[in-house]
Amino acid sequence: MSDIWHVLSVILVVLIPMALMVLGAARWAGYLRGPASLSPSHRRMLEKYALPYQRTASKDRPRFEHIVAQFIADKEWQGAGIGVAEEMKVLVAATAAQLLFGFDDVRLDHFERIILHPDSYRSGRKGTLHQGEVRPTAGVIMVSWGDLLRGYGNPRDGHNVGLHELAHALWFEHKLSEDKAPFLHPELLQRWIDHADGEIERIRNGRSRLFREYAGTNQAEFFAVAVEYFFERPGEFNAELPELYTVLCGMLNQFPDKASLS
């Protein structure tokens, strides 16, 4: 019996320190891989500049902050003829948080770079004037900082280039993830496409009850414009196109017409 206890004691002496080392390493690795935390200065910027955050209920602000911090940490930030200040990162990330708030773990991972231009810029072979662009193959989202600010300067006009370009990114992110981890419910997405086809036709015929003409370009542009109206004019969207609005609520898991600051 004494021999058995001796063997057990040796095993425990060896295994316990090893287990503690493994657990400690795992905790440290988990810490390194854990979510980014929002700095106090970034939180102050959110409170001062970010209208979506200001409109978020107090109980939901920690989640909003988490998405902002993670988005800032995940992306490579570049300026095209402009220095990228921390306030710029915070406002773009707050726009992303507004769009992504209803998803459990969608970070737009295919888009690694955010490029900010000082204002509208010319791009492409024809030198077309742009307020923003999304390039899925390059993993790039580009936004005109001046136009982004103007969009937030009039938050009820249904025009916000930040929401527009990030909606494009979300649309492409789903398509790029469709074979592995799609996050837009397939039945809701099909209902969206069916309703959108009819509304696009009405836009092209000048009979739209809500959306601006540009939404009739194609399905991708229709979705991006609809997202702008969804967050900036939700009551009107719901009143004019209730079926389409309800489907988008389900797709994004958000109900902005019922949002509260409580």
Q: Across the structure, where does each feature detected by a protein language model lie?
A:
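Active-site recognition of the HExxH zinc-binding catalytic motif
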Residues: 57, 157-174, 224
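N-terminal signal-anchor transmembrane alpha helix of single-pass membrane proteins
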Residues: 1-35
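N-terminal topogenic membrane-targeting module
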Residues: 25-81
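Generic beta-strand structural signal
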Residues: 112-114, 139-141, 159
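Peri-catalytic and regulatory segments of divalent metal-dependent proteins
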Residues: 60-72, 76, 80-100, 104-110, ...
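Metalloprotease/metallohydrolase-associated module, dominated by Zn2+-dependent proteases
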Residues: 72, 89-104, 119-143, 147-153, ...
